[in-house]
Amino acid sequence: MNKPFIDVLAGQRQSVPPIWMMRQAGRYLPEYREVRAKAGGFLDLCFNPELAAEVTLQPIRRFGFDAAIIFSDILVIPHALGRSVRFEVGEGPRLDPLDTPEKISTLSGEADLSKLEAVFEALRRVRSELPQSTALIGFCGAPWTVATYMVAGQGTPDQAPARLLAYRAPEAFQRIIDALVDSSIAYLLKQLDAGADALQIFDTWAGVLSPREFARWSVAPTRRIVEGVRKIRPDAKIIGFPRGAGALLPGYVTETGVDAVSIDWTAEPGLVRERVQSKVAVQGNLDPLALITGGAALDQAVDDVLASYAGGRHIFNLGHGITPETPIAHVEQMLARVRAYKG
């Protein structure tokens, strides 16, 4: 049976765009909150194959999305590299900062992927339970974005600690990037082996970089990951998400070799259609706040996305993750609007 999501990545436009949501397994769902409470901490949930598989499947059962994305986190790679990774309630991730060349010299260059066996087991479980027409997405964080957390030891408003280190000590910063590239290739290949149909590389903080730094720290490492995965799995379908890249999107697509690019809601439709969607599939790009709003504003926002991109190869998604306060009824409204599209 065909998977519409995979068909789009393979170059076939669909009359009704396939749809899924970033963070579709999340706190807006009461069934997720119930499992999360049972699991304990966030990483406890990520590393419990039974529970991670369950929350991955929940939005598929409820909404019938065209793709499931494995429940995990981009910071499992630093964990596999031997770094301390903790999630503090209400504060987000905490790591031991790699903020000097001396500290970076202690970084292991090779990930222990046995620490991530729970992710691969969760993928196998989900694969066995998904409908045949539903795709399964594995993922990793892009090296730049993961490095921003490793350098600062936490999330920061403008990623200044990593940007400063990359300017002041580029050779040392490159060591972090190299370790993340190699680890990500191995991690993504293992996800494919465990049943993933496609992969997404999340570069959440790509948009803070100048064009020169974007080319060095976002584009080049992503290209190395794509090439490394395809060296072993030439048919691998890979989506890039350089959030906030804007006018740099065409170059990103050309240079990285991705099959599709996910875009945020600030992307200019004309530029994307003419210089991006003419080359690869486009995924996105509903504003998550329009989804919170609902009503006529949501209908208009959905229609705008469809009018902009559904004429070409398009996967309907949000421009970033769904937020916890989003009403379920608004997700149902969005789904009905997209599935009623006649293109």
From Swiss-Prot:
Q: Which GO terms describe its molecular function?
A: uroporphyrinogen decarboxylase activity
One family from Pfam that matches here is URO-D
The protein's matches in InterPro entries, at most eight in alphabetical order, are given as: UROD/MetE-like_sf (IPR038071), Uroporphyrinogen_deCO2ase_HemE (IPR006361), Uroporphyrinogen_deCOase (IPR000257)
**Which GO biological process entries does UniProt record here?**
protoporphyrinogen IX biosynthetic process from glutamate
Q: Which residues are tagged with the site Transition state stabilizer?
A: D73
EC class of the enzyme, as a word: lyase
**Which pathway is recorded for this entry?**
Porphyrin-containing compound metabolism; protoporphyrin-IX biosynthesis; coproporphyrinogen-III from 5-aminolevulinate: step 4/4
* Keywords (A to Z) from UniProt: Cytoplasm, Decarboxylase, Lyase, Porphyrin biosynthesis
Which EC number(s) are documented for this chain? 4.1.1.37
Can you say where in the cell this protein is located?
Answer: Cytoplasm
- Its main subcellular localisation, reduced to a broad class, is cytoplasm
Q: List the disulfide bonds.
A: none
Which reactions is this enzyme annotated as catalysing? uroporphyrinogen III + 4 H(+) = coproporphyrinogen III + 4 CO2
Query: Which sites bind substrate?
Result: R23, Q24, A25, G26, R27, D73, Y149, T204, H320
What function does this protein fulfil? Catalyzes the decarboxylation of four acetate groups of uroporphyrinogen-III to yield coproporphyrinogen-III.
Would you identify the family this protein belongs to, as annotated?
Belongs to the uroporphyrinogen decarboxylase family.
Subunit structure, per the record? Answer: Homodimer.
Please give the name of this protein: Uroporphyrinogen decarboxylase
Q: Which organism is it from?
A: Bradyrhizobium sp. (strain ORS 278)
**Taxonomic lineage of this organism?**
Bacteria, Pseudomonadati, Pseudomonadota, Alphaproteobacteria, Hyphomicrobiales
